[in-house]
């Protein structure tokens, strides 16, 4: 009696187990990725308070949440750190529309994704935050994910405007998702350029003097 087709094509048990595991992993991974995409439309991306009721930080908000979130927090100024090459998407278009409808001022100070870039972008961003706050206008600063570029600007604001230590600002960066360690590009950049940023803020009338000693970012 000939073997059935199923008997000839049936995979060995070990191989079947491996395939089953791979399928399960793929399903789980797909579920995680899917949830991350769904979550962006339910919760404002990386929305956090810097100064209660006045200064906020975030990632780029989804087109479904940007207007309602800005309106809820009475945002009057948006400090955008995203580069021009990252701004051609529906979320950016929705943000532009929301800003127009809500009468929000948008200020652009682009930084590269690895947080390096022009010192002037840091200076301009910190100055915009301080000016908006001084006029009692709530402000949000954001990049794409709300972690590195936003973390760098907030760290400069914390240390040079609010008087935080470099260590305290570093710990906040880590708590917000920045990779720990003195060799992290953001930490290296801040330690190399914080003096120049401070000097330019003095020249712009944002702070009275360059801190002495300068803040050192690290554990």
Predicted regions and their residues:
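Substrate/cofactor-recognition hotspot
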Residues: 146
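Short cysteine clusters
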Residues: 143
């Amino acid at each position: 009696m000939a073997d059935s087709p199923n008997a000839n094509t049936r995979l060995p048990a070990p191989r079947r187990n491996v395939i089953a595991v791979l399928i399960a992993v793929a399903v789980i991974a797909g579920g995680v990725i899917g949830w991350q995409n769904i979550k962006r439309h339910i919760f404002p991306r990386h929305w956090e308070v810097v100064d209660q009721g006045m200064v906020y930080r975030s990632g780029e908000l989804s087109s479904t949440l940007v207007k309602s979130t800005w309106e809820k927090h009475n945002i009057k100024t948006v400090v955008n750190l995203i580069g021009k090459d990252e701004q051609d998407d529906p979320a950016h278009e929705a943000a532009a529309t929301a800003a127009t409808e809500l009468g929000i001022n948008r200020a652009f100070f682009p930084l590269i994704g690895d947080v390096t870039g022009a010192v002037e972008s840091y200076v301009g961003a910190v100055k915009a935050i301080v000016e908006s706050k001084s006029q009692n206008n709530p402000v949000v600063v954001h990049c794409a994910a709300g972690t590195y570029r936003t973390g760098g600007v907030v760290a400069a604001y914390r240390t040079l405007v609010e008087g935080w230590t470099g260590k305290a600002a570093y710990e906040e960066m880590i708590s917000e998702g920045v990779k720990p360690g003195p060799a992290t590009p953001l930490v290296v950049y801040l330690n190399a350029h914080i003096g120049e940023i401070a000097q330019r803020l003095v020249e712009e009338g944002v702070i009275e003097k360059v801190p002495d000693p300068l803040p050192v970012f690290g554990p």
